[in-house]
């Protein structure tokens, strides 16, 4: 009997949906074992009420991508939890908040002001800010109410498994689907990952060439020159987060001469990506002068170390208690 699958996108961009579609013929093969009963709002012509009408626990597997940003997102993930036996936080936004989680460094009022009033491309002479309720003649229009901060979905519901990536690489998605179909899943609460760091699968890794990693003697930003395509980006001074990031992507960014920014999420059992990253960087900076360079070139280091994981960070949860 085919496993029933539901896919829900909440506060995200749809890239994780496309990662599933990118399975191409592998997705066709998987459909011999899976019955997709719901996929919204991107792929199937269904309504949220269709999900709400399904019997509780009637769906074997629910994939949720995107973070929780408003009350509609919050309601829908609760409905998914009610209807699905297994929930997977699919992609880094669902797992840890993702890039939209950077909004947690600002108040909602500041975000709205910058988006709708101060933006150089916005024509809004009356300084109108969207409201949850607006009346147009005899009609009352509503928008989902913003929450005070971005949340990963496990702050709203219990999550069974996590998958990193922005989006997850389609090869890894295929392995996730296979694990689900065969029932070869890790313990509940685990990340579904190969357990390797980006550095472990990166051809630039000095260890692969029989060399040792050097201390970083200079900190560079990506626009400061063109990195040597053969040498480790960290050894060249670029702030690559490969040592602390799950490598299920196959080191795609270093392959095209771009530093790893950490979208794969932390390597288990690490709980806080940013803390692990600063610990790793601190161990390879050559001296205090290099540390000063780091602080000068990255004055808001939080935006680098927590680019994909701020809502799931320990410090974020402490601040919002």
From Swiss-Prot:
Its EC number is 1.12.99.-. One of its GO terms (cellular component) is cytoplasm. It comes from the Archaea. Its main location: cytoplasm. Keywords: Cytoplasm, Oxidoreductase. Coiled coil: none annotated. It holds the Pfam family Oxidored_q6. One of its GO terms (molecular function) is iron-sulfur cluster binding. It is found in: Cytoplasm. The F420-non-reducing hydrogenase is composed of three subunits; MvhA, MvhD and MvhG. It forms a complex with the heterodisulfide reductase (Hdr). Belongs to the [NiFe]/[NiFeSe] hydrogenase small subunit family. Part of a complex that provides reducing equivalents for heterodisulfide reductase. This is F420-non-reducing hydrogenase iron-sulfur subunit G. It comes from Archaeoglobus profundus (strain DSM 5631 / JCM 9629 / NBRC 100127 / Av18).
């Amino acid at each position: 009997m085919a496993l029933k699958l539901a896919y829900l996108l909440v506060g995200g961009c749809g890239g994780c949906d496309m990662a599933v579609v990118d399975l191409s013929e592998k997705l066709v093969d998987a459909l011999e074992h899976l019955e997709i009963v719901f996929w919204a709002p991107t792929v199937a012509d269904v309504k949220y009420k269709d999900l709400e009408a399904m019997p509780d626990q009637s769906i074997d597997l629910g994939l949720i991508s995107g973070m929780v940003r408003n009350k509609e997102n919050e309601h829908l993930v609760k409905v998914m939890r009610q209807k699905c036996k297994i929930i997977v936080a699919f992609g880094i936004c669902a797992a840890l908040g993702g890039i939209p989680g950077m909004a947690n460094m600002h108040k909602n009022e500041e975000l709205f002001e910058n988006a709708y009033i101060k933006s150089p491309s916005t024509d809004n002479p009356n300084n109108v800010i969207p409201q949850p309720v607006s009346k147009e003649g005899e009609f009352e229009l509503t928008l989902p109410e913003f929450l005070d901060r971005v949340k990963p979905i496990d702050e709203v519901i219990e999550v069974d498994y996590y998958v990193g990536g922005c989006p997850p690489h389609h090869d890894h998605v295929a392995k996730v689907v296979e694990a689900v179909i065969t029932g070869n899943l890790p313990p509940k609460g685990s990340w579904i990952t190969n357990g390797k760091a980006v550095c472990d699968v990166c051809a630039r890794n000095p260890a692969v060439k029989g060399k040792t990693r050097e201390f970083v003697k200079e900190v560079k930003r990506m626009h400061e020159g063109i990195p040597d395509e053969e040498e480790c980006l960290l050894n060249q001074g670029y702030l690559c987060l490969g040592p602390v990031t799950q490598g299920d992507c196959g080191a795609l960014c270093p392959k095209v001469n771009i530093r790893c920014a950490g979208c794969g999420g932390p390597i288990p059992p690490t709980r806080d990506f940013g803390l692990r990253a600063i610990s790793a960087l601190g161990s390879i900076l050559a001296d205090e002068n290099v540390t000063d360079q780091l602080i000068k070139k990255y004055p808001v280091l939080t935006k680098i170390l927590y680019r994909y994981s701020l809502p799931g960070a320990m410090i974020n949860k402490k601040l919002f208690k």
